[in-house]
């Protein structure tokens, strides 16, 4: 086990001392993008039918590209401000979010319904249930990763109160664990069982196993989701967590929430957050929403497989379905993945010169 020195091994002061991870789209570029979305929006048109070349991003795409690069290959997160919001309906803003995803990579399905874009919005689900998911609940979430190289969140409406985004570097947490509790770091390099929250595809088991930390080709990969580990304990055949495993989990969460390590932010309407899911752990506080449906908290979430991805550890193959670089990978295939989904994956991967799993 080694300490990793990298831009992604940041602490709070590192983020506060520089703004190289923060990007702004100016008003003129935002207006151009708004007009492009409005001209292309059709309530009855399937999102899969849009091509990246249809959208006019102007010079704003260079800004978004830099933000993607920062999140993917440097600090592990970035924020873009200035997406057009005021003159777009919720559905038009959804199309804008989708358009960004089309240019940035191949979107991946996110759940039981095999949905390729999700509204991060409270629909009354129970986060702690065996099939619970955080994005459809207003509960406070555990620190976790998503099942894709990158997560993009775009903010249309913020909550009445709460809903604060929390991000901690998994790389930094790894380093702290080695320094302070090397005995627990050794446990973190061993496999833990995670539940698929009853969203497994027909060819998948209800659980998968992964270490919390693993090294491949000189890169550190981080994985964590307490809620899924706890859910897995109720699934037949999953071994009971050992005392040391429980202590490792608790110590990891304690590190992640240290004030000097946990970065917090509120996403404002028109903000976009980009997170690297094998470097960063993210969470969110609980929130109180508005009664008015038009004002309710709404963020759009995309899971992306980018064309410049790197090789993953061998053990991640069950988790991502492929570990090879520049391969379409990740996502929760779910139970509604059909020919329409497969055709989108095939067509869009070809557009981006990416490879796709064929078996």
Language model regions located:
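A short alpha->loop->secondary-structure connector
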Residues: 97-107
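"Short basic amphipathic alpha-helical interaction patches in structured regions
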Residues: 91-98, 167-169
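Active-site environment of non-heme Fe oxygenases that use a 2-His-1-carboxylate facial triad
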Residues: 1-61, 65-66, 72-73, 78, ...
């Amino acid at each position: 086990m080694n300490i990793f020195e990298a831009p992604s091994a940041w602490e709070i002061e590192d983020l506060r001392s520089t703004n190289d991870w923060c990007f702004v789209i100016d008003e003129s570029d935002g207006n151009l993008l708004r007009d492009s979305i409005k001209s292309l929006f059709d309530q009855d048109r399937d999102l899969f039918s849009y091509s990246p070349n249809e959208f006019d991003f102007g010079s704003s795409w260079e800004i978004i590209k830099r933000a993607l690069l920062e999140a993917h290959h440097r600090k592990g997160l970035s924020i873009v401000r200035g997406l057009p919001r005021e003159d777009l309906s919720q559905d038009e803003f959804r199309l804008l979010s989708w358009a960004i995803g089309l240019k940035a990579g191949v979107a991946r399905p996110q759940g039981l319904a095999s949905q390729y874009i999700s509204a991060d919005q409270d629909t009354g689900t129970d986060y702690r249930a065996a099939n619970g998911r955080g994005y459809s609940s207003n509960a406070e979430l555990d620190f976790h990763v998503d099942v894709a190289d990158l997560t993009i969140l775009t903010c249309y409406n913020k909550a009445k109160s709460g809903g604060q985004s929390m991000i901690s570097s998994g790389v930094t947490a790894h380093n702290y664990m080695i320094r302070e509790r090397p005995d627990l770091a050794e446990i973190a390099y061993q496999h833990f069982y995670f539940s698929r929250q009853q969203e497994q595809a027909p060819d998948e088991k209800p659980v998968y196993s992964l270490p919390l930390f693993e090294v491949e080709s000189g890169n550190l990969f981080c994985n964590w989701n307490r809620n899924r580990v706890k859910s897995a304990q109720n699934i037949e055949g999953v071994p009971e967590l050992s005392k040391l495993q429980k202590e490792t989990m608790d110590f990891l969460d304690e590190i992640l929430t240290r004030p000097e390590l946990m970065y917090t932010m509120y996403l404002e309407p028109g903000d976009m957050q980009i997170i690297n899911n094998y470097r960063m752990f993210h969470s969110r506080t609980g929130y109180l929403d508005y009664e008015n449906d038009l004002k309710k908290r709404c963020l759009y979430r995309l899971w992306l497989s980018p064309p410049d991805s790197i090789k993953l550890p061998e053990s991640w193959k069950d988790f991502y379905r492929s570990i090879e670089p520049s391969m379409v990978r990740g996502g929760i295939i779910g139970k509604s993945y059909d020919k329409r989904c497969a055709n989108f994956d095939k067509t869009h991967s070809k557009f981006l010169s990416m490879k796709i799993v064929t078996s």
